[in-house]
Amino acid sequence: MNAVTTEKIIIPRSALFLGYSGLVPFVVLSLLLWWSPPHYAEQIQHALWLYAAIILSFMGAVHWGVAMAKPYDSGTGEPDKRMLLLSVIPALVAWFASFVSGLAQWSILYIAFTGLCVLDTESTKRGDLPAWYPMLRVPLTIIVVLSLINAQLAIAIA
């Protein structure tokens, strides 16, 4: 009789707590945009956009850490250049989006969060990130993207 075993993947509690706690500003600020007077809405928009840009940069930095922690490339004595490059792109995208006016800057952010999530999932498949990472990252990204779309709609309708 062949036994099939599957390893149960468990997300570390600290990562779970911090990850979901990090959603609070996204959700709260995006909802506040629907009910805020115009003079407060601009400050809320700025706070949400800035928080999203910072978190996007932070998420990209995961790959910098991976590049530093894993063995250096085949004898070159240098970290994985692909991982280093991937780590700085989200910060550059967020910075670029700060120069874009109107609703497009929100689209840039939620597209970047989505793209980075896909890349993170691929990095997990390659063994660069822990198996639990996408199980945390995908639901968080969905909530972030929905919050940013919600904010974009609230701004467009206001």
Locations of regions flagged by a protein language model:
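Core segments of alpha-helical transmembrane spans in multipass integral membrane proteins
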Residues: Y20-V27, L48-P71, E78-F96
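Short, Lys/Arg-rich, polar N-terminal cytosolic tail immediately upstream
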Residues: M1-I11
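Juxtamembrane boundary at the C-terminal end of a transmembrane helix
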Residues: N150-A158
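Membrane-interface helix termini and inter-helical loops of multi-pass transporters
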Residues: W34-Q45, I157-A158
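Transmembrane helix-loop-helix
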Residues: S98-G115
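Interfacial loop-to-transmembrane junctions
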Residues: S123-V145
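Transmembrane alpha-helical segments of integral membrane proteins
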Residues: I111-L129
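The first (N-terminal) embedded transmembrane alpha-helix
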Residues: P12-W34, T141-L148
